[in-house]
Amino acid sequence: EMSRGLGDVYKRQVAYAQGYDVKEDKIDEAMLKEAVETAKNADVAVIFAGLPDAFESEGYDREHMGMPDCQNYLIQEILKVQKSVVVVLHNGSPVEMPWADDVSAILEAYLCGQAVGAAEADILFGKVNPSGKLAETIPYHLEDNPSYLNFPGDGQKVEYKEGVFVGYRYYDMKKMPVRYPFGYGLSYTTFEYSDLQLSKEKIKDTETLQVSVKVKNTGKMAGKEVVQLYVSDKTNAVMRPVNELKNFVKVELQPQEEKTVTMELNKRSFAWYNTKVNDWYAGSGTYEILIGSSSRDIRLTKTVELESTMKIPMEIHTNTTISELMENEKAKEVMKDLVDQMMANIGGGEEGSAASEAISQEMMIKMMENSPLRALRSFAGISTVSYTHLTLPT
């Protein structure tokens, strides 16, 4: 397929050597020697590598992220005699790339159709400008994966303990170094982002937000860029990923051409699933809008204030803390007299006593704030009667 795509160029300028047997992970010295000699005498060595059926297929799970040793060894040996090495990968999922920093380029083809050879030739020879972006993070090692400690489990049960922290949500939250981040992908040209605009500075969760940004092709070749929009929740209501992809758009630009792209965000773009109401909930507060070329390449940011129209009922039980109650206006009304009494009791110790010197008033206040309701009966002289009659106005 590649030879047909290249036509006469293939016959005149391309020399081929097999290098390894795809059916087994074994170093064939004769094949290896031929490949090294061929690469040594070339201007550029293009190595096709990846995962054979024995390593990756439907019906069973991979046990590691490595490619066949014979392929990694071939790449390392060719790097000894050739500075310009391009690796074309055919694989259905991420692989470890111990040679990634040494090769000139990597073309990730994944598992394409029968015309993949011609498509790869068009990219390698500059007829087509690549514009794909990674839909997954490529970690350095299998052990970096968030599910590593829990999979495959005990043979009978697998626990999915990652929660929402899967993929880039995990790696970016932990600020872990990765081989290639989510949304990453190179081009033969370059793009510049500018003039991020939001349709509103404040919105309700019943409204939509229009986000626009200018993108310019600053290179010499026509190309396409995938502009990615991430949202970061700054309300601190619950633990959430540091940012989440909420929209994206692909724009084609001629050299030095600039266009404005617009994306829309709605309630779901800011929301998380709240089990107290069994619905998607976006809390009131500040949210950051981030525009980037990948999850690790953020170019522009702005903030928007969101007002929630959904009221979350407060569940009060014996383990509810004083600080949680004081954040609720109705609960604060009921708790005011009790809190005042506790504050007075905290400051009522005998002056100069060893206990007063050892435990500061600030420490006692922190202890009070973090104390559950059930502790009121013994904390700072609150009586059982006061505790029993603690009710909230409706």
Task: Show the residue positions of the predicted features.
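Intrinsically disordered, low-complexity Ser/Thr/Gly-rich stretches
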Residues: F165, K175, S187-P313
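An anion/phosphate-binding loop that grips the pyrophosphate of nucleotide cofactors and donors
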Residues: A42
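Glycine/threonine-rich flexible loop motifs
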Residues: L51-P68
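Low-complexity, Pro/Ser/Thr- and charge-rich linker/hinge segments at domain boundaries
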Residues: E307-E327
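Single conserved hydrophobic/aromatic residue that forms the stacking wall/gate
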Residues: E1-Y10, H389-T394
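Conserved, compact domain cores that house catalytic/ligand-binding motifs in diverse enzymes
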Residues: I322-T384
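Secreted, periplasmic, or luminal enzymes acting at the cell surface/secretory milieu
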Residues: A15, H90-A222, L290-I291
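Short connector loops at secondary-structure junctions
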Residues: R4-M31, L51-F55
